[in-house]
UniProtKB/Swiss-Prot annotation:
Major localisation: cytoplasm
Entry binding sites for GTP: 373-380, 419-423, 473-476
UniProt xrefs under InterPro entries: DNA-bd_dom_put_sf, EF-G-like_DII, EFTu-like_2, IF2_assoc_dom_bac, IF2_II, IF2_N, P-loop_NTPase, Small_GTP-bd
Organism: Buchnera aphidicola subsp. Acyrthosiphon pisum (strain APS)
PANTHER family named in the record: TR-TYPE G DOMAIN-CONTAINING PROTEIN, TRANSLATION INITIATION FACTOR IF-2-RELATED
Name this polypeptide is given: Translation initiation factor IF-2
Biased composition (Basic and acidic residues): 140-171
Residues annotated as domain tr-type G: 364-533
Length: 864
């Protein structure tokens, strides 16, 4: 049969060409609309369509389950029950009368046509063979005309054969059609019978499954019997003496004996372990550090294999050896695994990369100048004169206790000033001020000279590699000595330009204003030499100079912008805190919408009060900023806990002696972050070996009810620095008589804490000798035992006082006077030069020549 086009086939099967092409593609035959299909491809397509029609919408699919329980004996002799479920699926097709008839007719027509084509092909082949034989027998002398005649004859015969076949096909088609009608009737009858016998068939399937299960059980029983029979035969056979086999069989027999109750129960399930043929390469995720055992677990191999590989690479370690990221990566890659390096701060790196850094065009910025020096040397007064304000007048105790950031516009140019405290407790503040500054102005009083905090300021400036300008203040005083200041500073490598050094010295008076303009000129000249520049566009970066909690506005941070533009509405990430900027205020308290480089501003909108010195970064996504902040907080907490739990010999001995140490528990509240850091640091330095300062709570803002409750529970004192307690806290403090103290000057706070620590010190006892008596004779008393007849040689002997007995100037006994008599009369004391009888409690070994030393114990107050 010749090839058929897809259009003809679609008409025959009654399927659209598109669906036909789709079905052909499913079975792996790619065709287009104009293509032809051969007989083999047609047969495959028809089989596919027939199987697809089996599970049509009129198909009923039923599942049958047969359950059985098996008992399996384990290694320990115990039996384990296993549920076995056999599932069987049956499909029942609804017989659609017209569709089935048409489909069967089509199918039979196709079969009939296939049979005809095959018979015709066979006849043609035979006919061609006969012609070839005839032609071979004929001689070569025949002409071409005879060949043409033969060919004409052959063609005539072909036409006759075709006519004959067509007539034959029409007759056979009628017969086949009648047969198909009969077959369809038989199928309908059988389908009805299947529907009637639905319950019967399902029952038969269930019975069949049970029979199969019973057969398996019987086979297992037979096998079990054979094993026992073979064992008995081997046991009786004297020639069989292989020890290894005997032991193994005895072991199996004993096991069977133990489980004799269940020996008839079959074992159908068996677990088989197959060893992997090749090494499986895995994706190994490695963080910053990993132990050898964890690395082995991730690669799904034994730890010994990893250690072997490490030794080959020249790394010696145990199973608990901690590997760094690079080493672990080398080992894993050496063993053929793919390494995925996990960075814990990946989100932080991502958020920092996704920032608009501006056009990278730098512009000249104002210098950041830090004023440093000893306390009361006139730092704030000098700044007040420059700013034309009176800050020092309003400050408690006349001393600065926080970093003040101010932006001053002068006729010569703009300068940002940072005023730092000079007290020794504010070391951290001063060092932080130097880290963010460009120039340091060292203020030294002409009448006072170089002081401890002056030296400390010089050290901070040198560490930060910042140029120092020396301002010699208070030159208006009569006792000022400028040359003495210059000579003192020379010891610390601060030399004036006049003396061949690098530092500029300016004599000023904060009171009269003398030399102030010269100082400003020098600052701007130094800034010009430094060529201070910063990018003025893009997302801002800065540093927290100071932070505090405002009762009405919430957490507030004073931020000095380093580069970019800090705008209202920006999302900022600041240490452990984050937030969206709600408000920006300058040093004068005026609200601004943006701030550029070297401009200090107050930022409102952070989640909590940040730490001074934290870096402020503007980011795009607030959600990611929150995640980074919480991650930083968690890492800091983990680090703190790991340091606390670190055990060594020193800590162990400290814990043993801990009971002998007194603790002064303190809850500290301050107005700003810088003061809080300074006070807590100074308090912890006051701790001694006998009295420890323990700060159980510290924070920024007023004293709350929570602070009062914590003080009550932990028996602590509450210290408030420039803050007050609220109403609810006052109620608890008054009702429970808690110790609450307010301070505005750091000196007073430290002095009172020292006094409280002195009260906690264990008292010191001193022995004061009040009299000496020499033993001249001894005699016995029925009431007191041995009595010493003595002469008082020095001081006064008092009754019931503690005594020492000395023999050859060595203390041999320490006790108490029990009896003191003179001329048979009890007395309370005997003075120098008189004789007396002394009875000593629980001691009878008194000899002539011993000296009795009488003393009294006095309690001495200790000072820190």
């Amino acid at each position: 049969m010749p090839d058929i086009s897809l259009k003809v086939l679609s008409n025959e099967i009654k399927i659209s060409i598109q669906e036909l092409i789709k079905e052909l593609s499913i079975i792996g035959i790619t065709k287009t609309e104009d293509n032809y299909i051969n007989v083999l491809e047609k047969n495959i397509l028809l089989k596919h369509l027939e199987s697809k029609k089996k599970y049509s919408l009129d198909t009923l699919v039923l599942q049958r389950k047969t359950r059985s329980t098996l008992r399996i004996s384990t290694v320990g002799g115990k039996n384990k029950s296993v549920q076995v479920e056999v599932r069987k699926k049956r499909a029942y097709v609804k017989n659609n009368k017209f569709e089935n008839e048409s489909f069967l007719n089509e199918k039979k027509v196709i079969k009939h046509s296939m049979q005809k084509t095959s018979s015709l092909k066979n006849k043609e082949k035979k006919y061609i063979k006969n012609i070839e034989k005839i032609e071979l027998n004929k001689s070569d002398s025949r002409s071409l005309n005879t060949k043409k005649e033969n060919k004409l004859k052959i063609s005539n015969k072909d036409e006759q054969n075709k006519k004959f076949n067509q007539h034959r096909e029409s007759n056979s088609f009628d017969l086949n059609h009648k047969k198909r009608i009969k077959e369809n009737k038989d199928i309908r009858i059988s389908h009805k019978e299947e529907k009637q016998d639905y319950h019967l068939t399902t029952f038969l399937h269930a019975r069949q499954a049970e029979d199969e299960n019973d057969r398996e059980v019987e086979i297992d029983k037979r096998n079990h019997g054979r094993i026992l029979k073979n064992y008995r035969q081997k046991k009786n056979n004297k020639n069989f003496h292989n020890g290894r086999y005997n032991k193994e069989e005895i072991r199996t027999f004993n096991r069977n004996k133990k489980n004799s109750k269940q020996k008839n129960k079959p074992i159908l399930l068996q677990q088989v372990f197959q060893k992997p043929e090749s090494i499986i390469n895995r994706d190994v995720i490695i963080s910053n550090t990993i132990t050898v055992s964890d690395l082995a677990n991730k690669m799904a191999i034994k730890s010994s294999e990893v250690i072997k590989n490490m030794m080959n690479m020249g790394i010696i370690g145990t199973i608990n050896h901690v590997l760094d990221q690079d080493t672990a990566q080398l080992i894993a890659e050496e063993m053929g695994h793919k390494v995925i390096v996990h960075r814990e701060n990946a989100l932080e790196e991502l958020i920092m990369k996704d920032r608009d850094t501006g056009n990278d065009v730098s512009a000249i910025r104002a210098p950041v100048v830090t004023i440093m020096g000893h306390v009361d040397h006139g730092k704030t007064s000098l700044l007040d004169y420059i700013r034309s304000t009176k800050t020092a007048f309003y400050e408690a105790g006349g001393i600065t206790q926080n970093i003040g950031a101010y932006h001053v516009k002068t006729d010569l140019g703009s300068i940002t000033f940072l005023d730092t405290p000079g007290h020794s407790a504010f070391t951290a503040m001063r060092s932080r001020g130097v880290q963010i500054t460009d120039i340091v102005i060292l203020v030294v009083a002409a009448d006072d000279g170089v002081m401890p905090q002056t030296i400390e300021a010089i050290q901070h400036a040198k560490e930060a590699n910042v140029p120092v300008i020396v301002a010699i203040n208070k030159i208006d005083k009569t006792d000022s000595d400028i040359d003495k200041v210059r000579n003192d500073l020379m010891k610390y490598n601060i030399l004036s330009e006049e003396w061949g050094g690098e530092n500029i010295f300016v004599s000023v008076s904060a009171k009269t204003g003398k030399g102030i303009n010269k100082l400003l000129n020098v600052i701007l000249l130094q800034a010009e030499m430094l060529e201070l520049k910063a990018v003025t566009t893009g997302m801002a970066e800065g540093i927290v100079v100071e932070s505090f909690l405002d009762k009405g506005r919430g957490p507030i941070a004073t931020v000095l912008v380093k580069k970019g533009q800090l705008k209202k509405g920006d999302v900022i990430l600041c240490g452990f805190e984050y937030g969206r900027i709600k408000s920006l205020r300058d040093a004068s308290g005026n609200e601004v919408f943006s701030a550029g480089p070297s401009i200090p501003v107050e930022v409102l909108g952070l989640s909590k009060v940040p730490f001074s010195g934290d870096v402020v970064t503007v980011v795009r996504d607030e959600k990611k900023a929150r995640e980074v902040a919480s991650y930083r907080k968690e890492k800091s907490r983990e680090k703190k806990l790991s340091n606390q739990n670190r055990i060594n010999l020193e800590n162990m001995f400290d814990d043993i002696n801990k009971n002998n140490v007194s603790e002064l528990k303190i809850i500290l509240k301050s107005d700003i972050q810088g003061s809080l850091e300074a006070i807590s640091g100074a308090l912890l330095k006051l701790s001694t070996e006998e009295v420890k300062i323990k700060i159980i709570g510290l924070g920024i803002g007023g004293i709350t009810e929570t602070d009062a409750s914590l003080a009550l529970a932990s028996n602590a004192i509450i210290l408030g620095f420039n803050v007050r307690a609220d109403t609810s806290a006052k109620k608890i403090i008054n009702s429970e008589h808690l110790d609450l103290r307010y301070y505005s000057v750091i000196y007073d706070l430290l002095d009172e804490v020292k006094a409280a620590m002195t009260g906690l010190l264990s008292p010191e006892y001193k022995e004061n000798i009040i009299g000496l008596a020499e033993v001249r004779n001894t005699f016995k008393s029925p009431k007191f035992g041995l009595i010493a007849g003595c002469m008082v040689t020095e001081g006064v002997i008092k009754r019931s006082n503690p005594i020492h007995i000395l023999r050859n100037n060595i203390v041999i006994y320490e006790g108490e006077l029990e009896s003191l008599r003179r001329f048979k009369e009890d007395v309370n004391e005997i003075r120098n030069g008189l004789e007396c009888g002394i009875g000593i409690k629980n001691y009878n070994d008194i000899r002539v020549g011993d000296i009795i030393e009488v003393f009294e114990v006095r309690e001495m107050k200790r000072i820190l």
